[in-house]
Regions:
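Carboxylate-rich, polar loop motifs that coordinate divalent cations or form catalytic acidic clusters
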Residues: 1-251
Length: 251
């Protein structure tokens, strides 16, 4: 009887000791993907976005941060599919349904009400997962600008599917997209601006730029403001003509 009791004690000790490293490992992994801090995860900031609850989300080159006016909740990537796919944040976007989308250099995801993330597969060649920018059309389509590819979100399969395999015909490797009042998608790169009908993604216009564009902005969904090294252009997306630059700016 004594031998049986000693054997049971020994087995219990082995079971307890074998559980401890697993628990410690799980706790360590949890700390790796979630942290509460008085400071931001990285000083190199890439994007800002306010969500429906009023939290400020801040993307950096190393981690995502949610700020509540007192502290930062930091999020990092891991091998868990319920976490960020990558730590370098490219874009944070809230759509018309108040969903928060995050694009990284290693994939895209959507924030959930469980305080985790749903990673969204991207169906493009060469296993490219570098998301650059989210755009939403007036009829609720979510596009993913990957610079060299353009994808659209399929809610039935919960995937981003490629529309164009070559979305950068000028090979500039720098491109920003906008939706105008007519639900047209405009793609701006350093040497040209292109217009697509977002309903069928047919190219409707392409305008070469007289100077290399370094920055662009869509104003009131009706005009593109395009900055070059020493000049500002204003392009009316309704008439598809360049407008006269205000004298105070042009001078």
């Amino acid at each position: 009887m004594k031998k049986i009791i000693l054997s049971l004690i020994a087995l219990s000790a082995i079971a307890v000791s074998s559980c401890q490293p697993t628990t410690a490992k799980a706790e360590a992994e949890k700390q790796d993907v979630y942290r509460i801090s008085a400071t931001i995860s990285n000083q190199n900031i890439t994007d800002f976005q306010e969500d429906a609850q009023g939290y400020i989300w801040i993307g950096t080159t190393r981690g995502l941060n949610r700020f509540n006016a007192h502290e930062y909740r930091q999020y990092y990537s891991s091998n868990d599919s319920l976490q960020l796919p990558g730590d370098r944040i490219q874009d944070i976007f809230m759509d018309s349904r108040k969903r928060l989308w995050i694009a990284t250099t290693n994939g895209t995801c959507r924030y959930t009400d469980q305080d985790n993330f749903c990673q969204i597969p991207i169906n493009v060649p060469y296993n490219n997962r570098n998301g650059h920018q989210f755009i939403e059309s007036k009829d609720g389509k979510i596009f993913l600008n990957m610079v060299v590819h353009l994808c659209v979100y399929n809610p039935e399969t919960d995937t981003f599917n490629r529309i164009f395999i070559n979305f950068d015909p000028d090979k500039t490797y720098k491109q920003t997209c906008y939706i105008d009042n007519n639900n047209c998608l405009w793609a701006v790169n350093p040497v040209s601006i292109r217009c697509y009908d977002s309903r069928n993604m047919q190219l409707t216009d392409s305008i070469p730029m007289p100077q290399k564009i370094t920055y662009s902005y869509m104003h009131n969904h009706t005009s593109l403001w395009l900055a070059s090294k020493n000049r500002l252009f204003i392009f009316d997306t309704e008439s598809k003509r360049f407008k006269t630059t205000p004298e105070a700016i042009s001078n």
